[in-house]
Amino acid sequence: MIYTDFKGEKISQLGFGTMRLPVINGVDKDIDEEKALEMFDYAYKHGINYFDTAWGYHEGNSEIVVGKALSRYPRESFHLTTKFPGYDRNNFPKVKEIFAKQLEKLQTEYFDFYLFHNVCEYNIENYLNPEFGVKEYLVSEREAGRIKHLGFSDHSGIECFKRFLDAYGDVIEFCQIQLNWLDWDFQEAKEKVRNL
């Protein structure tokens, strides 16, 4: 496995994403746990130490299965990523409740990486609304040690991307964007990389 250094942490360059785990009878929420656990074991034994999930993957069940799978390994041996579900504007008033539930579902006391999920034109006003206090709350969780690194995932146009960075750039350590190595114009990836 090839690893990279991120702020003193050894991260596998190949990560394990859990948006599309094996399912039973084609039903997205019904994860085939036996097959999923085999996949986690294979990845872990072959050096993958970066695991990515999110609140909404598999209708909320991805985090549960990821928690079961990773609880079998020493916590310091892997890097766990999940995300605040900003794709649903109804979640903004519930940031504390959601964060606590994610810790429970993932059977962990902290997240190595935590993202503001799917920043886009649809939800940017909620991310920028001080009434919700999402930024302040998640920064406080980082200060308390329950988040090591705070970032965001983006599916917006460049103007929305810049607005988010203007407001959150002082606390952001990393970003996930849609990047197609053969088509750098997809979702304005080239321009986003320039702005990071």
Where does each model-flagged region fall?
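Structural preference for beta-strand elements that scaffold enzyme active sites
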Residues: 3, 11-15, 49-50, 77-83, ...
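Beta/alpha (TIM)-barrel catalytic core signal, keyed to glycine-rich beta->alpha loops juxtaposed to Asp/Glu
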Residues: 119-196
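Generic structural signal for well-ordered alpha-helices
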Residues: 1, 40, 63, 67, ...
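Active-site mouth loops of central-metabolism enzymes
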Residues: 20-34, 83-93, 122-127, 156
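Short, acidic/polar
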Residues: 28-43, 91-107, 156-166
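Active-site groove signature of glycoside hydrolases
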Residues: 104-126
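N-terminal binding-site loop/beta-alpha segment at the start of enzyme catalytic domains
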Residues: 1-78, 137, 143
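Active-site beta-loop-alpha junctions enriched in small/polar residues
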Residues: 19-21, 54-56, 83-87, 116-119, ...
